[in-house]
Amino acid sequence: MPNLTGKVAIVTGSTKGIGLAIAERLVNEGASVVVSSRTAEEVVAVAARLGERAIGIACDVADPAACQALVAETIKRLGRLDVLVNNAGAGIIKPISELTVEEWQIQIDVNLGGVFYLSKAALPHLSASGDGFIINIGSLAGRNPFGGGTGYNASKFGLVGMTEAMNLDVRHDDVRVSIIMPGSVNTAFGGGEQKAERSWPLEADDCALAVMQLLEFPKEAHVSRIEMRPSQPPRG
């Protein structure tokens, strides 16, 4: 595992599921972690549970001003930023005939807009760290379309392209950008999993381990994406 002592990370959508598992791993490896989601009470409670190296800052990633405020408060309280994990997501699975304009827009605003707003605000600080990393949590729905996925697939396909284009933009500024694309994960989030995988999904900590693997690579190496799917049914 990487030694993250002295590093500072923001993890969005980190009060439960994949985001919480990532935050726990980061803290365990020595990082200071900003736990973030839309609900102030939840982020404070989760941060307290994670211990003295975690703080909670609420943020609606669909709001550009809130994203700027999240980064500014992180720098004010922790002094630096080394890792940004864009995990917050929205998934509304409906055929296009039933999907409303508002439901379409929230998926675009959170799954694409939030990544753009927060990454843009964080980039100067990530570059200043000398070894910054943006890790976007995507989905296999970003390469495998399915019925009912008009909005969700569009946002996740777009996130793959955004990740790779962003990396080309910032690779000479001491920042790497990668995406982790899991299949079905055993969490409360219900967007975009294929039925064939739902009977034996990945665990949230599998995704957290993938984050640790990316952070363990030397800065001279870049893994653009990690695709994850269950290799076998659970035992027992």
Regions found by a protein language model. Name each.
Residues 139:
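Residue(s) in the substrate-gating loop at a strand-loop-helix junction
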